[in-house]
From Swiss-Prot:
Alphabetical GO biological process terms: menaquinone biosynthetic process; methylation
UniProt pathway: Quinol/quinone metabolism; menaquinone biosynthesis; menaquinol from 1,4-dihydroxy-2-naphthoate: step 2/2
Protein name according to UniProt: Demethylmenaquinone methyltransferase
Lineage of the species this protein comes from: Bacteria, Bacillati, Bacillota, Bacilli, Bacillales
Catalytic activity: a 2-demethylmenaquinol + S-adenosyl-L-methionine = a menaquinol + S-adenosyl-L-homocysteine + H(+)
The keyword S-adenosyl-L-methionine is annotated on this UniProt entry: yes
GO MF, one example: demethylmenaquinone methyltransferase activity
Ligand binding (S-adenosyl-L-methionine): 58, 79, 106-107
EC number(s) per entry: 2.1.1.163
UniProt-listed NCBIfam families: MenG_heptapren, MenG_MenH_UbiE, PRK00216.1-4, PRK00216.1-5
Gene for this chain: menG
Gene3D superfamilies to which the protein is assigned, alphabetical: Vaccinia Virus protein VP39
Length: 234
C-alpha cells in the first residue's frame, strides 16, 4: 500500500532522530546555524514574551527562543515525531531551561486557542507537512495581533549554474552523506525530494499573504539555497 506523505515523513524522522543534528550540520556545512542566528536578530525577540516553534524537531530553535524570552517568558515546541522530541527533551534538560514545554502534536491542527503567541516559528519543517497553506493558516490563527510568524526553509536558487549545482548536490550527494554517516539513504533521499518540490521564494511569500499575513519580508541565504519569510498579523 502506498504511504501518504504524512506517514512517510513520520517514518523518516522517527528513523533519523539520533543523527538529525549531526547531519544538519554536515548537509548545510553548518550554515543553518548562521541563518537561524540572523533570523533571530531580525525577529528581535523580547523578554517575557510567549513563542511557539512548530515542527520543532530536536528543539534547537525552541531553545534559542527560550533563551531569548528569558525565564519570565514561555516557549512551546510542537512536533509529530516522538523520537525527535525525546532528543529535544534531553537538550532542554541539559540546559536547565524551565520555560520550555515540548508537545507531541500535529502542525495541521495546532492545539492552542486563537491569538496565543507573540512569535510563531517553523524551521525546515514546512516542506514536510501535507498541506502548506493549512499550516500557515494555523500559524496565523494562533499568532497574536501584532505578532510575528517566521518560516526558515530550503528554497530554490535562481542563479544559473549554482541552481544546477544545488540540485545535483541535493539529489545525489546528500543521500550519500545519509548512507555513509547515518545509514539512512532512503530517508535522506526523501529530504531532497521535499526540498526540490517546495515553492520558491516569491510563491511562498504569496502564500503568506493569502494566509492573512501582512508586511511580508523575504531574506534569501547563501545564493538562495534557504530563505526566511516573516509576516505580521494585524
Amino acid at each position: 500500500m502506498r504511504q501518504s506523505k504524512e506517514e512517510r515523513v513520520h517514518r523518516v524522522f522517527e528513523n533519523i532522530s539520533a543523527h538529525y543534528d549531526r547531519m544538519n550540520s554536515v548537509i548545510s556545512f553548518r550554515r543553518h546555524l548562521k541563518w537561524r542566528k540572523d533570523v533571530m536578530r531580525r525577529m528581535n525577540v523580547q523578554k517575557g514574551k510567549k513563542a511557539l516553534d512548530v515542527c520543532c524537531g530536536t528543539a534547537d530553535w525552541t531553545i534559542a527562543l527560550a533563551e531569548a524570552v528569558g525565564p519570565e517568558g514561555k516557549v512551546y515546541g510542537l512536533d509529530f515525531s516522538e523520537n525527535m522530541l525525546k532528543v529535544g527533551e534531553q537538550k532542554v534538560k541539559a540546559r536547565g531551561l524551565h520555560n520550555v514545554k515540548l508537545i507531541h502534536g500535529n502542525a495541521m491542527q495546532l492545539p492552542f486557542p486563537d491569538n496565543s503567541f507573540d512569535y510563531v516559528t517553523i524551521g525546515f519543517g514546512l516542506r514536510n507537512v501535507p498541506d502548506y497553506m493549512t499550516v500557515l493558516k494555523e500559524m496565523h490563527r494562533v499568532t497574536k495581533p501584532g505578532g510575528i510568524t517566521v518560516c526558515l526553509e530550503t528554497s530554490q536558487p535562481t542563479l544559473f549554474g549554482f541552481r544546477q549545482l544545488y540540485y545535483f548536490y541535493f539529489r545525489f550527494i546528500m543521500p550519500l552523506f545519509g548512507k555513509l554517516l547515518a545509514k539512512s539513504y532512503e530517508e535522506y533521499s526523501w529530504l531532497q525530494e521535499s526540498a526540490r518540490e517546495f515553492p520558491g521564494r516569491d510563491e511562498l511569500a504569496e502564500m503568506f499573504r493569502a494566509a492573512g499575513f501582512v508586511d511580508v519580508e523575504v531574506k534569501p541565504y547563501t545564493f538562495g539555497v534557504a530563505a526566511m519569510h516573516l509576516g505580521y498579523k494585524r
